[in-house]
């Protein structure tokens, strides 16, 4: 028989949605050499709307002016450019990847690239004006965005020096070694 009165403190449990958002913040903080606090990421996410894409859905089409910024929350996104009827995958985006049409974002020009879902994917869409306003109003976000842009430049050169060199077998082996989630989650035709 127990006479002691016990107080039970409940430990708050994160819902699946909150766990997913915490994981997304962690991934974004690994995207470059600067990080932001959970609250700062929440401020950015509040500016976004969520878009659910099915495999093959096109988010940005060549010729469209689409200046907004996107963050991959779930799934795999790919960037495609065209030489006539021939398409070439030039990049993939996994959760935590930030992307946009650089032509549209910076100069309000039609997009050169096509951005599409490789599988069921969820992206967060942040209007360009809100993204720019946040860089004006939040120093830590502005620093993060600048370092992310520099990281994107690094990745572009890295892609040219590795992924776009060699024969198909060598490129596939490189993909298996460096980005197995893409090799396992995308059809072989796209790779």
Tell where the protein language model's regions lie, with residue ranges.
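Short, structured interface segments that constitute the first stable element of a domain
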Residues: 20-29, 40, 107-137
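Generic detection of short hydrophobic beta-strand segments and adjacent strand-loop junctions
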Residues: 51-53
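Short, low-complexity, intrinsically disordered N-terminal modules
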Residues: 11-13
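Cyclic nucleotide-binding regulatory module and flanking cytosolic helices
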Residues: 16-49, 104
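Polybasic "coupling" helices that flank or enter modular domains
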Residues: 116-191
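Cyclic nucleotide-binding regulatory domains
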Residues: 32, 57-119
């Amino acid at each position: 028989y127990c006479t002691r009165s016990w107080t039970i403190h409940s430990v708050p449990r994160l819902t699946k949605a909150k766990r997913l958002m915490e994981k997304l913040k962690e991934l974004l903080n690994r995207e470059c050499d600067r990080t932001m606090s959970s609250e700062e990421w929440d401020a950015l996410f509040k500016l976004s709307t969520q878009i659910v894409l099915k495999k093959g859905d096109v988010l940005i089409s060549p010729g469209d002016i689409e200046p907004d910024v996107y963050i991959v929350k779930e799934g795999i996104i790919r960037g495609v450019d065209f030489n006539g009827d021939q398409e070439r995958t030039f990049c993939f985006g996994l959760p935590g990847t930030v992307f946009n049409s650089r032509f549209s974002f910076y100069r309000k020009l039609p997009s050169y690239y096509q951005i599409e879902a490789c599988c069921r994917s969820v992206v967060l869409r942040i209007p360009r004006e809100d993204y720019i306003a946040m860089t004006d109003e939040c120093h830590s976000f502005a620093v993060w965005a600048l370092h992310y842009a520099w990281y994107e430049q690094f990745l572009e050169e890295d892609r040219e020096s590795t992924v776009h060199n060699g024969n198909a077998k060598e490129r596939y082996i490189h993909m298996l070694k460096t980005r197995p989630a893409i090799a396992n989650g995308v059809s072989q035709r796209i790779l």
